[in-house]
Amino acid sequence: MIIFVSEEPERRLAIVSNLYALVLKPVGKKPSDKPLCAIELLQKNDLKKYGFKRLTSHEIFGVIGLIEVNGLLFVGAITGKSKVAQPCPGETVNKIFAVDFFCLNDNSWDFIEIDSSGYPVLPETASTEYQDALPKHPCYELKKLLSNGSFYYSSDFDLTSTLQHRGYGQHSLSTDTYEEEYMWNSFLMQEMITYRDHLDTNLKQILDDEGFLTTVIRGFAETFVSYVKKLKVALTIISKQSWKRAGTRFNARGVDDEANVANFVETEFIMYSSQYCYAFTQIRGSIPVFWEQGTSLINPRVQITRSFEATQPVFDKHIMKSVEKYGPVHVVNLLSTKSSEIELSKRYKEHLTHSKKLNFNKDIFLTEFDFHKETSQEGFSGVRKLIPLILDSLLSSGYYSYDVREKKNISEQHGIFRTNCLDCLDRTNLAQQIISLAAFRTFLEDFRLISSNSFIDDDDFVSKHNTLWADHGDQISQIYTGTNALKSSFSRKGKMSLAGALSDATKSVSRIYINNFMDKEKQQNIDTLLGRLPYQKAVQLYDPVNEYVSTKLQSMSDKFTSTSNINLLIGSFNVNGATKKVDLSKWLFPIGEKFKPDIVVLGLQEVIELSAGSILNADYSKSSFWENLVGDCLNQYDDKYLLLRVEQMTSLLILFFVKADKAKYVKQVEGATKKTGFRGMAGNKGAVSIRFEYGATSFCFVNSHLAAGATNVEERRSDYESIVRGITFTRTKMIPHHDSIFWLGDMNYRINLPNEDVRRELLNQEEGYIDKLLHFDQLTLGINSGSVFEGFKEPTLKFRPTYKYDPGTGTYDSSEKERTPSWTDRIIYKGENLLPLSYSDAPIMISDHRPVYAAYRAKITFVDDKERLSLKKRLFTEYKQEHPEEPGSLISDLLSLDLDNKSTDGFKSSSESSLLDIDPIMAQPTASSVASSSPVSSASASLQPVRTQNSSQSRTPIKKPVLRPPPPPAHKSVSAPAPSTSKEKSPTPQTSTASLSSVTKNIQENKPLAQNRRIPPPGFSQNILTPKSTSNLASPMSSKVDLYNSASESTRSAQDARQQTPTAFAASRDVNGQPEALLGDENPIEPEEKAKLNHMTLDSWQPLTPK
């Protein structure tokens, strides 16, 4: 494809394929306008009259979507790729190494090359001042991310699916069947996909087959060619990381409220030969509980942030998703029994065994394998002790296999191994590699391709298998941490050398640096790509239908939205380091059972003593004391409260409780901290914050301890501003980005009066004395002037100053310092949906402060997403019926193309070249028993894919079959060659002039003699299993192609691609452009006074008027 631009009569971009052109133009020019883009699909020849000219010399290999950055609309396109894998004939995987973004509504970036730093490349004559004034390309960071070698796409098949799911030979590119979880450009493509969904089948096919919609995954793909005895096989790994909880190592941990876990990766190992096709799938993912880990340099502390009861429903949801998709899940937990990991491991097991939805030892199995302990004596080879522990599950879940000659499925995999360590990286890589090899060996023995006593670790296919897994481990680690995997030396060579150990040490140091200094920027780039930044909106495609539906939906919002009220109790208490057990009922239930809030958020300050030693060595066990004390008090009545979140920073602590029956409405619970003590280096001052969403309404709570001192008003203002800027949640959400905000804590604001004047007013208690003192309150003055806490309100304050008391008494400070009584402890709020009910202090005397509480009623909005979607679909149908031929709509534009009478040459099927149709010398086993990790050994250099016809038809999903054992042997070849070892003579090289007949003959020589299948052993089935993805048989075997044609096609493809194509692609060819390793190299390189309680009712709490 090629991209063109025209300014006549208005700016438009056209992406042109063989037959059609996709024309895009911006709609609306005001900066306040929402990002809109119009789209047309025209015949290629219709572009001539619009004065289009080529925008770039680079070929466009696929469109990845639309994005708006700083008011500019860009279309993203793949402009550099290399072929890296071919799991089956006609299925090619491409690695993306170059992406460009072309602006739709501004020509400033047309025809400009960008340097490696994102700035325009200027002629040498340009002045330095002019160069310094130039801006960086708005999409440079996205471009750099997408071009880092971890993103892949395919023009031939659905790369988001597994081979078993899509079916052998089913090369569908329809977005109807894509798994959105692995589609990393889903935000960029979502409006284009929605638009496509409104088209009929023929029009969908054009968009699919012309490559206008490209699905991009992130992960790994690579193919090696090897031999199993003398049978040539292609070994492939395709790995896909989910974007649902994507992020860098310490920014993405555990599970979220939607049951998505960090670093969730689906990995499929595929073997293809002329006889059989085999596939085995595994998954990995962070432990599905709510936990976090700090970024301290040494042994960062693991913190579980949500109670067991509140976590269990989300845990069950995550595991059940896997069970429904894959079948029984066997969990392999590699965490150690060290103090840093044991708590997390115990919680994992408790959730598995105490679940009421999961059938333990039926739907879910658990094997605990302390990796560090098991490998401490005999090295990493001790991981092999894992196989006997999981062997029963390995045999019962089986694998996917397909008979290439008879074109039918033999078996399916009905179960999955879910492996994890702490990061799901280094230990997990090694364990998954061992499991994969055990499953592959089982397949080879079942099908009598090897015998049980002929398997040796030095076999070439074993070395290639291990190298694939090592390369895969490095790539996944690069994505998550920025370095290669640890232990990869053992993965490749089966042993750990001194160089490997030194390499691991270097990687560990690199990870510490990256985690602390680089991950924040990387996380923001990921969030930009995924559309997670505040107020970031997808570019919408202008369409009269869409405008009609959007307007109608807005006017009919009452049909899918509802409102409700909830009660909240907010409390703040400076406990002055006290750990004395006390009844908190007068604070948490000030009118007893008559007010039991739905949500309770408490902020505590000075939970540890503020001494230099305690600040540097914070005792985080104090949080457990207050969690239990508050929890016991809240649960003294029939209503049960669950602890959903705890956030602690040194002496600051915030607790979030919710009624058990309301917990299902709470999502996206997060925490954040900001230090302001000692210029931001210490946590004695600062803030801890939590945020969550209740229904469709967002809440944020900030518990702060600001600078002390009667005259330090400016320092407190500075602390406030620092906290507002510094508190950042995931997806770069900040405090102002919420519907309801509560700020509470020991704010340390004082009364601007002499001490004796304040004490006299408090002693005399004349009418209106509270209001009189408030006229001199620093916080009240600051809010009224707008100098601090702009937009915040405080309920009517009618209680006496809360500081400073002699502990255990009602007497204000009688010490030598005699501090002026002040309202240091406050609760203020911001939000139109909030109604204050009560604001007072509580008579709890364990500290020199009094606790304060505020009760609120909040209006909550709920959105019924299913009803909204149903209404949206109905409105679309109504519009189409009323405007069947409205001009200007994409549908009528496409229908006018008269597709039935047009040539469909672009959809004709071409002959497919199989990777195994190439001369056998290509991947001949070498004398060395260890395969090189050089990319030259990868089959990517030899892949010659030809575009095939793609189907846009939806596949009807088939319900998950019951568990079955692995299959019986399919073919028994009486002429099977003798076992091959590394000492055997390699197959005779073919000359470079090998003809088609000689290549075909060579493959046919490996064909086993036809004979009856032997009777399967007990427990095995002779039934042929139907693939879940289709009821059709696979397409016939692709015909063989002439070797020189394939080579010449590859040469042309390489010339069309960018010159920056990886060296591996070029290094594998001789001076004549022929693939050397394929043709003649015998040894190829490898790869607030209160009313009496008994007279007080809830009705007596009338809404308070803010000051």
Swiss-Prot record:
One of its GO terms (molecular function) is inositol-1,4,5-trisphosphate 5-phosphatase activity. Changing residue 746 to A: Abolishes hydrolysis of PtdIns(4,5)P2. This is Polyphosphatidylinositol phosphatase INP53. Its EC number is 3.1.3.-, 3.1.3.36. Keywords: Cytoplasm, Endocytosis, Hydrolase, Phosphoprotein, Protein transport, Transport. The keyword Nucleotide-binding does not apply. Dephosphorylates a number of phosphatidylinositols (PIs) like phosphatidylinositol 4,5-bisphosphate (PtdIns(4,5)P2), but also phosphatidylinositol 3-phosphate (PtdIns(3)P), phosphatidylinositol 4-phosphate (PtdIns(4)P), and phosphatidylinositol 3,5-bisphosphate (PtdIns(3,5)P2). Controls the cellular levels and subcellular distribution of phosphatidylinositol 3-phosphate and phosphatidylinositol 4,5-bisphosphate. Plays an essential role in a TGN (trans Golgi network)-to-early endosome pathway. Involved in clathrin-mediated protein sorting at the TGN. It is found in: Cytoplasm. Pfam families: Exo_endo_phos2 (PF22669), Syja_N (PF02383). It catalyses: a 1,2-diacyl-sn-glycero-3-phospho-(1D-myo-inositol-4,5-bisphosphate) + H2O = a 1,2-diacyl-sn-glycero-3-phospho-(1D-myo-inositol 4-phosphate) + phosphate. It is an enzyme of class 3 (hydrolase). Belongs to the synaptojanin family. In the central section; belongs to the inositol 1,4,5-trisphosphate 5-phosphatase family. Residues 142-482 form the SAC domain. The modification Phosphoserine is found at residues 497, 986, 1035. Residues 927-942 have a biased composition (Low complexity). Interacts (via SAC domain) with BSP1; the interaction is direct. Interacts with CHC1. GO terms for cellular component: actin cortical patch; cytoplasm; membrane. Present with 1520 molecules/cell in log phase SD medium. It comes from Saccharomyces cerevisiae (strain ATCC 204508 / S288c). The modification Phosphothreonine is found at residue 1105.
